[in-house]
Amino acid sequence: MAKKIDAYIKLQVKAGQANPSPPVGPALGQRGVNIMEFCKAFNAQTQGLEPGLPIPVVITVYSDRSFTFITKTPPASILLKKAAGITSGSATPNTNKVGKVTRAQLEEIAKTKMPDLTAADLDAAVRSIAGSARSMGLEVEGV
């Protein structure tokens, strides 16, 4: 018989840097989950990724206080900011452009994000990421 699910916890934790301090500790502690066990497992799973890159994680907590977790791909906005070499998006994206991204950069980001996107093919994923880039105030070349 399947275990009874007690809760889902959604967090963004930096790759390889999970520790018991907030936000991880309080979110897991109030559900009775072993915090250090999660931190060790998460850090082991994300050690191949760029350190410090925020990784969304969905933790499923069961009624017997055990857990499983699924890591997602980094947010598109973080990847776009890194590709454009900027620290933040534009406050007025329609009038003030803060950087440029090329189609090649968008394709690279789309390939990274593909498992989490609902796009049918790579071209649709590129258009989706291009829309995110435009809403951040980035100039999109070649799309």
Curated annotation (Swiss-Prot):
SUPFAM superfamilies: Ribosomal L11/L12e N-terminal domain, Ribosomal protein L11, C-terminal domain. It comes from Thioalkalivibrio sulfidiphilus (strain HL-EbGR7). GO terms for cellular component: cytosolic large ribosomal subunit. Belongs to the universal ribosomal protein uL11 family. Part of the ribosomal stalk of the 50S ribosomal subunit. Interacts with L10 and the large rRNA to form the base of the stalk. L10 forms an elongated spine to which L12 dimers bind in a sequential fashion forming a multimeric L10(L12)X complex. Keywords: Methylation, Ribonucleoprotein, Ribosomal protein, RNA-binding, rRNA-binding. Gene3D superfamilies: Ribosomal protein L11, C-terminal domain, Ribosomal protein L11/L12, N-terminal domain. PANTHER family: 60S RIBOSOMAL PROTEIN L12, LARGE RIBOSOMAL SUBUNIT PROTEIN UL11M. Forms part of the ribosomal stalk which helps the ribosome interact with GTP-bound translation factors. One or more lysine residues are methylated. InterPro entries: Ribosomal_uL11 (IPR000911), Ribosomal_uL11_bac-typ (IPR006519), Ribosomal_uL11_C (IPR020783), Ribosomal_uL11_C_sf (IPR036769), Ribosomal_uL11_CS (IPR020785), Ribosomal_uL11_N (IPR020784), Ribosomal_uL11_N_sf (IPR036796). Pfam families: Ribosomal_L11, Ribosomal_L11_N. Signal peptide: none annotated. GO terms for molecular function: large ribosomal subunit rRNA binding; structural constituent of ribosome. This is Large ribosomal subunit protein uL11. GO terms for biological process: translation. Coiled coil: none annotated. It comes from the Bacteria.
